[in-house]
A protein has these predicted regions:
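Extended, charge-enriched "interface" segments that sit outside catalytic cores
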Residues: 36, 42, 48, 53-58, ...
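Short, small-residue-biased leader/transition segments that mark boundaries at the very start
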Residues: 1-8
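A structural-propensity feature for long, helix-poor, extended segments
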Residues: 10-43, 54
Length: 229
C-alpha cells in the first residue's frame, strides 16, 4: 500500500498468512499452522531475530539498543562460522571426544566446519579438547546465543541452501507480472477451472497465480509462454 518491500512467504509466517488470504481466500476462520508454510526450515524459531530485526528496525519498531545487540550477535555468529571454515583439526586431537559420543573416528584431518556437521558434535564439546577454539571463543567473547545459531547454520546448511534455492526460483515468478485487465477466458489453453479462479482472484504475478488452488503447473506454463519466462 505504501510502496515498501513486501513481507513474503520465505521471510515470515505473517507473509504466509497474508499471501494465503489474498490468493486462496477463506470460507472459515483462518488458522496459522506451520504446516501452511513451504519454507519451514527458513522460518525457524531460532532465527526469527536474524530474519525480522532489520525490517523491524527499518520501520521503527526496534530500539537502538536492541538493534545494536542484534548486530553484535550477527557479527559473532559470522566470526565463529568463519573460524570453523578455516581451521583444520587432526584426527588425534578429537579422537577421545568422538569416542565419548560413539561417533566414527576421523581417518584424516578435517575442517572444523565438517566435523561440526556430525549430529552429536557441538562447539561446547569441541572447545574442551581444542585449546585454540576455546581461546578464540574467549577472546571474541562468543555468547551461548551466538554459538547456538552458528551451530544450527552449520548443521542444517544443506537443507537451508536447498530451501533458499527453491525460494529464489519462485521469486523469479514473482517478477513476471500479469496485466490487471487481462482476460483469462481468452486463453483456451488454460483449464476451465484455472480460467475461473484466475478471473476471480486476479493475481498480480505468475508467482501468486502458481499458489492458487485449482491452477496446475501446466496452467502456469501456459501463462509463462504468454507473459515471458
Amino acid at each position: 500500500l505504501v510502496g515498501s518491500e513486501m513481507c513474503i512467504r520465505d521471510r515470515a509466517y505473517i507473509g504466509v498468512l497474508i499471501d494465503d488470504l489474498v490468493t486462496k481466500g477463506v470460507d472459515e476462520p483462518y488458522r496459522m499452522f506451520t504446516s501452511r508454510a513451504e519454507y519451514r526450515i527458513l522460518l525457524r524459531q531460532d532465527n526469527a531475530d536474524m530474519r525480522l530485526t532489520p525490517k523491524g528496525y527499518e520501520i521503527g519498531l526496534i530500539s537502538e539498543e536492541r538493534y545494536a545487540h542484534f548486530l553484535q550477535k550477527k557479527s559473532l555468529v559470522e566470526s565463529l562460522v568463519a573460524f570453523a571454515r578455516r581451521q583444520s583439526v587432526k584426527a588425534s586431537e578429537i579422537e577421545s571426544y568422538l569416542k565419548s559420543l560413539n561417533s566414527e573416528p576421523l581417518t584424516q584431518g578435517r575442517k572444523l566446519y565438517e566435523v561440526l556437521m556430525r549430529n552429536d558434535v557441538t562447539f561446547r564439546g569441541l572447545k574442551e579438547v581444542l585449546p585454540r577454539l576455546r581461546r578464540f571463543m574467549e577472546e571474541v567473547a562468543i555468547t551461548d546465543e551466538a554459538m547456538e545459531e552458528a551451530e544450527i547454520q552449520i548443521k542444517y546448511k544443506g537443507y537451508i541452501e536447498r530451501e533458499k534455492f527453491i525460494a529464489e526460483k519462485l521469486h523469479r515468478l514473482e517478477n513476471i507480472r500479469i496485466p490487471a485487465d487481462f482476460d483469462f477466458f481468452s486463453m483456451n489453453s488454460l483449464t476451465i477451472e484455472a480460467r475461473q479462479k484466475l478471473s476471480k482472484i486476479r493475481p498480480e504475478t505468475i508467482g501468486r497465480a502458481s499458489r492458487i488452488p485449482g491452477v496446475s503447473p501446466a496452467d502456469i506454463n501456459v501463462l509463462l509462454v504468454k507473459f515471458g519466462r
